[in-house]
Amino acid sequence: MISMIINKAIDLGQGKIISIETGKMAKQADGSVVVRLGDTMVLATVVSSKKTPPPNQDYFPLQVEYREKYSAAGKFPGGFFKRESRPSEKEILSARLIDRALRPLFPDGYLFETQIIVTVISSDQINDADVLGGLAASAAIMVSDIPFHNAMSEVRVGRINGKFIINPDVNELVNSDLDICIGGTTDTICMLEGEMKEISEAEMLDAIKFGHDAIRRLCALQNEIAAEVAKPARPFAPAVIPSELTDLVRGLCETRLRELAYTPLRKEDRAEQTAAIYREIIQSTVEHFKAAISPEEIQADPSKALCLNEHIIDEQIHAVEKKVMRHMILDDAKRLDGRTLEEVRPISIELGIIPRAHGSALFTRGETQALVTITLGTKKDAQSVDNLTNNADKKFMLHYNFPPFSVGETGRIGSTGRREIGHGNLAERAIKMVAPPEQEFPYTVRIVSDILESNGSSSMASVCGGTLALMDGGVPIRKPVSGIAMGLIKEGSNYAVLSDILGNEDHLGDMDFKVSGTRDGITACQMDIKIDGLDYHILESALEQARRGRLHILDKMEEAIPSARVELAQFAPRLTTIQVPVDAIGLIIGKGGETIRSITEETGAEINIEDDGTVTIACSSVEGTHAALATIKTLLAKPEVGTIYLGKVRDVRDELGAFVEFLPKTDGLVHISEISATERVAKVSDHLKIGDRIKVKLVDVRKDPRTGKTRFALSMRAVETDAANGAPQENNQENQ
């Protein structure tokens, strides 16, 4: 049977026409679509297993993969094998954007293994495919038979000269003062992530509303296509838990969990006591139903077997725990650690605690602790970025590490996880907005945040610690940046916004909203919503409460260090920049890099040369910098008659004289008659040997009429005569 091809397009304004097509490609997947903007095209497919999940599975195994094919832009992949390999950071971050927006929209209890693959099959290298991938993934699910709540769309919002733009291209983003990716349904926003140049909370809301208008239209387009495809939904019904199980569990644990919730405890102590309650309740429940339910009853009503399933009992206890904590916050405005809704945990800051780092800070907020260091380098240390829309070098980076011991666990140590990449990217974007321009501070900057303890908001601790480490290292950032994670508990029209959330509040709550910024505005944000129907007035309230929390944290940071240190750290490289003629670059580099390597080995300085003749010298010692600079200046020096040089004897001719290299790659002749002012020289080798270092004066420069080469006449006798007459010799130049 030939599939019906459906292709529909929508004009979002400003020349942004997006089309969605289904029925042509990847027809054996449960759902597939191709989304196009300009000449950028993404293919999204979704397949959900029909195999019944294991009875003890308690999570939704959703896998989202986003891949950019180099062939999409007519490029070859780098590397020896010339094919795509593991996903890049850009691909991982794009996959996370899609995953975070889609995951809450699958029905509760749907635990079938599901895989979404988004592939960029064409790239015009102008329109980024990441938000198109979110739209395509949702559309692929909508045309499938997989259970799904609502169509979801993603857009990017930029702003140029005060005017908002939907899905700005890479050229427009250069001039935009914000870059926000927004994911949402017709009724609500479910995901935010972006960076901004210190915009206000009101401007942020305006940008979200502008993006939501486009999202509604894209969702309507998906619904139109889904209605035409008209694929019947596969049967799915979540397991019905017997009421006698929920009643028994609630009766056994509700009071105990409430008492525990109202007792402020350390994370470790709370976890131990909670685990003990779980173990006791599970054991008591299983024993109760073993005695109460006969095998015949289970055979007659298989749902009664759930009463003996420890995993199901665990889920029911967790539901009671969640309800207890949420009502404690909503009814009594109390939190697990005894704080008020808006209270930020105690903050402590130590600076300069890593002696050899170029800047360091230990930032502790409650039971979350980040050890952050900075390293300053040269352009050689920049990270090479090669993707479909960006081939520039990256000179400002933040790497976030989350070892298992930070939460008191053992675990895998190896390649960086997706969560670590995502958290590091958010913190990097927050601080990048206040980094000094390259013209003023030409260093490559690497920030490393190692999370030593975690009980919520570790990415925001990385923002605060990263800012402090930069200031400790003398990096002239424009303004300090702080970050705070906000939470939400919502039941009907009743809600509470929480500042500086704990891990449990994140897990049991409805929102995780991270906001970073300066005193003057927001620089980065990330929001994930677990519920439908987030009203804009709640979002406005959360942003304002986050602003107050952000300022409180900035006060604490500025108490520790009011401004960046004036000097760089002792072991940080000092950069000196000079401009040389373009035709002199080869002279400095030397044959096969011989000369520049020699300078590096002798002085300890690292030297970078740009194509325009900009030479950057990096060295941690002043002496090394001066030595390298002097050597380069000597290399570039032009021979001047009357100048005295310290040269090296390269060749000796007994009856003629000695050839001396008085400048790099420049030899002159000291005639036998010019060797001594006090005696007659009969044999040159009696006075000079190859390798000797001698002072010579350039006395004449002329061109050989026969060969056209420039000849340099040098004199040792003139140096002796000048010294005897007391002539100044300030112009001495040494050939290194």
UniProtKB/Swiss-Prot annotation:
Source organism superkingdom: Bacteria
Cofactor: Mg(2+)
Organism taxonomic ancestry: Bacteria, Pseudomonadati, Chlorobiota, Chlorobiia, Chlorobiales
Name of the protein in its database record: Polyribonucleotide nucleotidyltransferase
GO biological process: mRNA catabolic process; RNA processing
Family to which the UniProt record says this protein belongs: Belongs to the polyribonucleotide nucleotidyltransferase family.
Cross-referenced SUPFAM superfamilies: Eukaryotic type KH-domain (KH-domain type I), Nucleic acid-binding proteins, Ribonuclease PH domain 2-like, Ribosomal protein S5 domain 2-like
Signal peptide: none
EC number: 2.7.7.8
The keyword Magnesium is assigned to this record: yes
Domain S1 motif: 642-717
One GO location term (cellular component): cytosol
Gene: pnp
Domain KH: 573-632
InterPro entries from the UniProt entry: ExoRNase_PH_dom1, ExoRNase_PH_dom2, ExoRNase_PH_dom2_sf, KH_dom, KH_dom_type_1, KH_dom_type_1_sf, NA-bd_OB-fold, PNPase
Pfam families for the chain: KH_1, PNPase, RNase_PH, RNase_PH_C, S1
Organism annotation: Chlorobium limicola (strain DSM 245 / NBRC 103803 / 6330)
NCBIfam families tied to this protein: polynuc_phos, PRK11824.1
Annotated coiled-coil segments of the chain: none
Keyword list, A-Z: Cytoplasm, Magnesium, Metal-binding, Nucleotidyltransferase, RNA-binding, Transferase
